[in-house]
Amino acid sequence: ALVEFRTEGLLLRAAEDSDAAESDDRRDLEDVYGSYHPFFVRGDLDGDGRLDFAQAFVEKGASGLWFHVAVFFGTGDGTFQKPLWVERAISLSTGDLAIDRSLLVVTPDLSLDPTRRWRWEAGEKRFVDADEDSGRGRSDDEDAPDETPDQKPRARV
């Protein structure tokens, strides 16, 4: 297991359950799942049928803990590729990682609704914002007209 390493001048260590801040939301998840690890998830993120995993790493900065999230893709021989960084220097002590089908879901704070969902884009060989095209969670279209170009009412979500 990858416990500690240096990348781009930063000394990072694997985030542990004890790096999570205590909260009612976290206790509720522990009650539901029994064994709950907020900073490690596994699944098939690239659709190749091989197990992949995402792991948060911790950097101890002057202002506290900063989390970096990496995905490790599985290989044909049962090992994993080098880390592919998805999120850098985020606050995650009150949040967690999850996988929803083939999406990596990063929730910075369990008590708040906003999440960031990342989809692997094989053609670009990188993770992209899964909600960017759909506009999910955006408020920049509030000034848009109430009708679409074909004169049908716009559905407000």
Predicted regions mapped to residue ranges:
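Acidic, divalent-cation-chelating loop motifs in proteins
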Residues: F40-D48
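Short consensus segments that form the blades of beta-propeller domains
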Residues: L29-D31, V58-S63
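Surface-exposed loop/edge segments in extracytoplasmic proteins
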Residues: G78-L84
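Acidic, small-residue rich beta-repeat scaffolds with periodic aromatic anchors
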Residues: A1-L11, T79, A89-V157
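Terminal domain-start segments
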Residues: A1-P38
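Acidic/hydrophobic-patterned starts of short beta strands in beta-sheet-rich repeat architectures
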Residues: G47-F57, R101-T107
